UniProtKB/Swiss-Prot annotation:
A synonymy between H.magnifica and R.crispa is controversial. The record marks 13-14 as: Reactive bond for trypsin. It comes from Radianthus crispa (Leathery sea anemone). This is PI-stichotoxin-Hcr2k. Keywords: Disulfide bond, Ion channel impairing toxin, Nematocyst, Protease inhibitor, Secreted, Serine protease inhibitor, Toxin. Belongs to the venom Kunitz-type family. Sea anemone type 2 potassium channel toxin subfamily. It is found in: Secreted; Nematocyst. One of its GO terms (molecular function) is toxin activity. This recombinant serine protease inhibitor inhibits both trypsin (Ki=2.4 nM) and chymotrypsin (Ki=23 nM). It may also inhibit the TRPV1 receptor, a receptor of the pain pathway. In vivo, shows anti-histamine activity, since it dose-dependently weakens the clinical manifestation of the allergic reaction induced by histamine injection. In vivo, does not show toxicity to mice by intraperitoneal injection. It comes from the Eukaryota. One of its GO terms (cellular component) is nematocyst.
């Protein structure tokens, strides 16, 4: 999704 993956890149950060 947009704000649901545990990645530190993109529109959202992990957490």
């Amino acid at each position: 999704g947009i704000c649901s993956e545990p990645i530190v890149v993109g529109p959202c950060k992990a957490g």
